Curated annotation (Swiss-Prot):
Naturally occurring in which organism (per UniProt): Xanthomonas campestris pv. campestris (strain ATCC 33913 / DSM 3586 / NCPPB 528 / LMG 568 / P 25)
Signal peptide: none
Gene that encodes it: apaH
Family annotation (Gene3D superfamilies): 3.60.21.10
A GO MF term: phosphatase activity
Protein name: Bis(5'-nucleosyl)-tetraphosphatase, symmetrical
Alphabetically ordered keywords of this record: Hydrolase
Composition skew (Low complexity), residue ranges: 310-324
Catalyzed chemical reaction(s): P(1),P(4)-bis(5'-adenosyl) tetraphosphate + H2O = 2 ADP + 2 H(+)
Amino acid sequence: MSVWAIGDLQGCYDITQQLLEKIRFDPAQDTLWFCGDLVNRGGQSLETLRLVHSLRAHSVVVLGNHDLSLLAIGARSEEEQRKVNPDLQRIVLAEDRDVLLDWLRMQKLAHVDRELGWMMIHAGLAPKWTTQMAEKHAREVEQQLQGGGYRKLLRNMYGDQPGWSPGLSGYDRSRAIINLFTRMRYCTPRGRIATDDKGTPGTQAQGLYPWFEVPGRVERDLKIVCGHWSALGLTITQGVHAIDTGAVWGGKLTALQLDTDELRVVQVPGREVTAPATAPRAPRRPRERQGRQRARGGRGGGNGNGNGGNAAAPAAAPGDAPQE
């Protein structure tokens, strides 16, 4: 039996099938861990979601920011749904939309297998969160998503504020937890998320750190596998294994085997992307580079503007939605 973690699919159905063939996935004995962002931008989001749903007995899924945005869109009126991008619109108007969205809503923000020694999240963790604390906070939001009041949560999850504090309550608390699990890249030593910095380490504003390199962070008792940050490429450092390699942006789709002592990485090329012509930019003053140790593989292509494959959200959500 093999256990494979797979990076952000983002609606790249054909490429997902190619990766499953390459790792020789056998549903009779293998298990897949999907790191979130199953949908959006790849053009085959409905097919991708149906595929992962069909594998639900043989897989584990954590929710990404794009998945939460899809759930929020699904909870709106049909008139509003017809204004979103075609890739997501096909899902919310499909005949089996209720089956797919009800199943997606039951998925996790964090998955832990202590026997295997791994935790899976989509984006990041607060610097002071142990894995036990992360599980507890994930369950708080999961219970709301899976309960009868989930529509109110989906309407109130948008926005950058407040930053995490143990004393938060209500939707402020839920929003802060969601932002950490699904939107985090850089933060301050106090755990304040910087949502505007999305590029590779060394390009961020002074005083910000990759969430897994923040000074004073707690030591964690599990290895972590995550996605979300395609600008990193394949990055293995500080017990964190970041495997979003930008398949939707022309990078690669990555699988990491979790049940072996020796790391095994399998990749397939991402979708073909034609880069738009861009006007020359004025040189930018280099920012202070934060020192780091990491193992890199093929870098996810990003979207050409240094934000690691996180272009402006589709016209579906108010404010700075979790679609980034």
